[in-house]
Amino acid sequence: GAVELPWADLPRAILMLYLGGEAGGEAAAKLLLGEVSPSGKLAETFPLTLEDTPTAGHYPAGRVAQHREGIYIGYRFYDAARRDVRFPFGHGLSYTTFHYDGLQIEAKGEDCWRVRCRIQNSGAAAGAEAVQLYAAALHPVMFRPPQELIAFEKVYLEPGETKEVCFAVRKRDFAYYSPGRHR
């Protein structure tokens, strides 16, 4: 899980290798030697301090944890609380750069949309980027996070190469459960 990293500004880089297994050493070497560009994205948010987390103060002494954060866990909490973080959910660094353009949203029936964009590797090294699609409720009938990840796709690109990414979004992708309405 995410931890405090008060020393994070001291090194020139931090390489996060989740569950690398027996191939983790070779993968780390290829990344550090520049043979492969990093392309992972964080699956969690790293706070600046423990006090910045949604669960701070909810773990009193003893064996009982108080889960009071509800839907505001992880990036949903930090977005809603507008808290600064050390490393945000869904972000990661690369040895190359990417440029997005051509965003289009097209209705495909009553409850389906196609969301497209182009992504170009604008840097000098081959690399991969996780294109992420977030949605927000305009007029929710109950509290909702400011945005939620609803789709993503990893795209591998050579320098100068451009690809189109297309997401099929359904009305159900915006659904949430209402405990009061039991639906």
Where are these regions (language model features)?
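Glycine/proline-rich low-complexity spacer/linker segments in large multi-domain proteins
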Residues: Y177-R183
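Intrinsically disordered, low-complexity Pro/Gly/Ser/Thr-rich segments with frequent PxxP/GP/PP motifs
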Residues: V141-Y177
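A short beta-strand motif that forms part of the nucleic acid-binding face
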Residues: A135-A137, V169-K171, R181
